[in-house]
Amino acid sequence: MTPLIEVRSLSKFYPIKRAGRGARLHAVDDVDLTIGTGESVGLVGESGCGKSTMVRLLGRLIDPTAGQVLLGGEDLTAMTQAKFASSASRRRIQVVFQDATESLNPSFRAFQAIADPLKRLLGMNNGAEMDRRVRATAALVGLPEELLQRYPHQLSGGQRARVGIARAVAVEPSLLILDEPTSALDVSVQAVILRLLADLRARLAMSYLFVSHDLNVVRLLCSRVVVMYLGKIVEIAPAEMLFTAPRHPYTQALVAAIPDPARRGEARPRLDGSPTSPIDPDPNACRFYGRCPKGADICTTAMPPLRAVGPDHFAACHFALSPHGGTDER
């Protein structure tokens, strides 16, 4: 598969004050990732794992501390944010945010919201072609034409979500980053929007980076899954492999926590202990060690590298070559 996005040694550290001295919060730490052309990749992990920071880095909404983001071989991080915003590459990466209510301009009608990126990124002027493009995009996402003259507060949650998706796909991006796009919606509406997203990817041949805490949704929509913990990638695998044979203890706990009536009564992995602080963490220790039920002394002295444990399957655990993802030694 031809790479569309290549992330190389990407880091984002935030300077903070701790005990009266300077320190750094490691939101994303030395991440490598590739997203192929037409591929749908899921990004999962608990709150604070770095998912949202990755969204902002890939969308060039913030600058990295170190590392590169390449789009079709072009280094986006070599540009200032202002230069990127006016570059031809800007239209190739679009983001659909968690809450359309927050991301839509309240003074823009739905028509204006969809037209805005066409003006800014494609240089289209008001006229017949603009009108045709907006209406065609609205139809593509299932937004009735009569709703195009309404303001966001006059639309339902599902309708606002469709407007947010429409304004992102209107410029025909190569990569659509979806940051928890359905989490603010009712369950019944979520299902409809998820079907829409699956249909759009098939029809428009876009790549997806789907960020979610809902593993069932990720399993449904994504061909490959990336698991993050405290700024680090701990596992990457084809979706079915990750859900049926996870190798990292953290991934095993996430998968075991998915509600499943067939496993009722079974013992599930528990994550006890104290999480490692993301503030200046020990570079020589596994970030997950404080909560890991299968850690050993080596985990405190050697950061486990992300290494192959199977076909297209990688895990950052010293014991991941074991099919059970660890050892019981402590």
Kindly label every feature range from the protein language model.
Residues A170-S174:
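A short, proline-enriched helix->beta-strand linker immediately N-terminal to the Walker B motif
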Residues G67-A78, S89:
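Conserved ABC transporter NBD signature motif
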Residues P3, K17, R24, I236-R330:
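Short catalytic/signature loops enriched in Gly
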Residues D75, A128-E146, D199, V255-A256:
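Conserved ABC ATPase "signature" region
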Residues Y151-L155, Q159:
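Conserved ABC ATPase signature
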Residues G59:
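Helix-to-loop junction immediately C-terminal to a conserved catalytic motif
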Residues P181, L185, V189-E266:
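P-loop NTP-binding/switch modules centered on Walker-like glycine-rich loops
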